[in-house]
A protein has these predicted regions:
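Bacterial carbohydrate/catabolite-sensing allosteric modules
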Residues: 1-12, 24, 56, 94-102, ...
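Short beta-strand segments enriched in small/hydrophobic residues
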Residues: 24, 29-33, 68-84, 183, ...
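Amphipathic helical "hinge" segments at domain boundaries
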Residues: 44, 48, 57-124, 128-132, ...
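Acidic, Gly/Pro-rich loop/turn segments at junctions of secondary structure
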Residues: 132-145, 157-165
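Short beta->alpha connector loops
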Residues: 112-115, 136-141, 260
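N-terminal helix-turn-helix DNA-binding module of bacterial transcription factors
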Residues: 1-72, 356-357
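Short catalytic-loop micro-motif centered on adjacent basic/acidic residues
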Residues: 107-109, 134-135, 194, 302
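Short acidic active-site motifs
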Residues: 63-64, 117-121, 142-145, 236, ...
Length: 357
């Protein structure tokens, strides 16, 4: 029977171990371990000797061994539906900044708005023993699924449904769509198109409800042809806007997501020769670079993206922090933070063309 031995390339330095540190410091292995982990009594002289040796040898703890010993990994997972969405980039950055202040690393995953992909990634993160998860919207949102995941893992929902014992951070998308629709109604528009994700996702459902509420408040029936909702917001783009603008009874205003959908609507207005805001008014949901840099600048439904990320991280840190913080989090049960929206008026809205309200 042949045997296999693991060899190390002479160009690859051997990993410095705690035994090496103990030997260099002239102390026992147990003393070195207590000094490095601050886990027991160590004399000041021994502590300084161990610290000097660790620094001289560039010692770094083995994260796997450390995780097995402490039961924590120091890593948090974050899942979003579309990493290409610039709004997510700002949220992710805010989460990372807050976690790093407490010594946590973050691993980001992309679900591509797929329930199957989300479940695969959640399972992967759990097997990698992350300390907690932040989950953004996904294709099919089931509160019972989040309850199941959170039985043995700290979970924070971000703009998605969750059970009574769950925790989440949400933007008031109902109010955002309601105020956007009222803004256009006050200008005289009645044929207002809404382009968003559908009711399977919390943000889409709230926007549709807010839009309907504003129309009903004015005694206006909703033309269902003007409500374009899709399981994936990415499916809504140029072709949908082009179809709406080419219709005989076209909309005079749009409320649309301020990412790829906004780009599709702007492309459709150019192709059909409709000018913003002279022929078509436009409000985007979610503010960013494109709405501000486009000419004319696009009126937007805005909210504090950094606050979303920071709040999600804060809730998760309380849940996984251990000690008093963890006890308080469990005693309080589910926590919810709801953030408000505001209309940022710019140059993309005007009264409808004469005779086309």
């Amino acid at each position: 029977m042949s045997s296999r031995t693991r060899t190390t390339s002479p160009d690859t330095p051997a990993r410095v171990t705690i035994r090496d540190v103990a030997r260099a410091a002239g102390v026992s292995l147990g003393t070195a371990s207590r000094a490095l982990n601050r886990s027991g009594p160590v004399s000041e002289a021994a502590l300084q000797a161990v610290e000097r040796a660790a620094k001289a040898l560039a010692y770094a703890p083995d994260p796997i061994a450390q995780s097995m010993r402490t039961g924590t990994s120091g890593v948090v997972g974050l899942l979003v539906s579309d990493l290409a969405n610039p709004l997510y980039a700002r949220i992710i950055t805010a989460v990372e900044i807050r976690l790093q202040r407490e010594g946590y690393a973050m691993v980001v995953g992309n679900t591509h708005n797929s329930k199957a992909q989300e479940e695969l990634m959640v399972d992967l993160f759990r097997r990698r023993r992350v300390d907690g998860l932040i989950l953004g919207p996904c294709e099919v949102e089931r509160a019972d699924y989040l309850d199941q995941v959170s039985r043995d893992l700290a979970v924070v929902a971000m703009d998605r449904d969750f059970g009574a014992q769950g925790s989440g951070v949400h933007v008031d998308h109902f109010r955002g769509a309601y105020e956007a629709c009222r803004y256009l109604l006050d200008l005289g528009h009645t044929r207002i198109a809404l382009m968003t994700s559908d009711g399977a996702l919390r943000p889409g459902r709230e926007r549709i409800d807010g839009y309907r509420a504003a129309m009903a408040e004015r005694g206006l029936a909703v033309d269902e042809a003007l409500v374009r909702a899709s399981r994936s917001a990415m499916d809504l783009s140029f072709s949908d806007a082009l179809a709406l603008l080419s219709a005989k009874s076209r909309p005079t205003a749009f409320i649309c997501l301020g990412t790829r959908i906004l780009s599709g609507v702007l492309q459709a207005t150019r192709q059909t020769g409709h000018r913003v805001p002279h022929d078509v008014s436009l409000i985007c949901v979610g503010d960013g670079d494109l709405p501000q840099l486009y000419s004319p600048a696009i009126t937007a439904v805005s909210w504090d993206l950094e606050a979303v990320g920071t709040a999600a991280a804060e809730i998760l840190l309380r849940a996984i922090g251990g000690g008093e913080g963890r006890s308080q989090a469990k005693a309080q049960g589910g926590q919810e933070v709801r953030l408000t929206t505001q209309i940022v008026p710019r140059e993309s809205c005007a009264p409808p063309p004469a005779g086309m309200a």
